[in-house]
């Protein structure tokens, strides 16, 4: 079992890597319809995932409902889904496009949930049927899906995941909502569909410590610039 201290070591390494590879303005987190929970939640959990991944479905079925009940619905954690299709084309990419096209109509999460519920039965011909089931404008969805809109954004998500050092799905990042990762408060990288208790241990530890006040000066440190260039600065 991966220990919390090892997770923090992995995260610190990922933060350094991101600082070297990411442009200064990369990926400020905005509400694009793929966020569950309160914007004021002190902790943010980001998932990098593939709709065709068995372990991702395991997280969706077994762990996410418990996180939702204990932390997300209670205003302690906000949850973000990010795409990490394991191939450059095929059903995994098409599923990500379908979810984004549903999101364009304000129905991202119903499609997200449907796709994971149907994992193993997904194929190219199924997505328009799901759009009908969840009540989307079928003409608008078909145009969005057939044109493969959002591909650039989908692959940008995947680039972020690989910069964290994730080479499989799912992968998770825990950060403080106000301020994002810093040298003093690094992100927590959680590779794989670990049990609920491991998420809870890290979340509870973060909740138990007083969050840094927004705008509070960071003590000078040779790695401060790395943290400031992180693509996960929250506004």
Language-model region placement:
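Structural alpha/beta surface segment adjacent to cysteine/selenocysteine redox centers
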Residues: 41, 49-132, 137, 205-213, ...
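Short, solvent-exposed loop/turn segments at the edges of secondary structure
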Residues: 14, 93-94, 167-169
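Bacterial N-terminal signal peptides that target proteins for export
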Residues: 1-11
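Bacterial Sec-dependent signal peptides at the C-terminal "C-region" and cleavage site
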Residues: 18-29
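C-terminal cap of thioredoxin/glutaredoxin-like
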Residues: 62, 129-235
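A short beta-strand-turn-helix
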Residues: 27-43, 71
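Bacterial N-terminal signal peptides
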Residues: 9-20
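Soluble periplasmic/extracytoplasmic beta-strand elements of cell-envelope proteins
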Residues: 44-47, 78-81, 171-173, 189
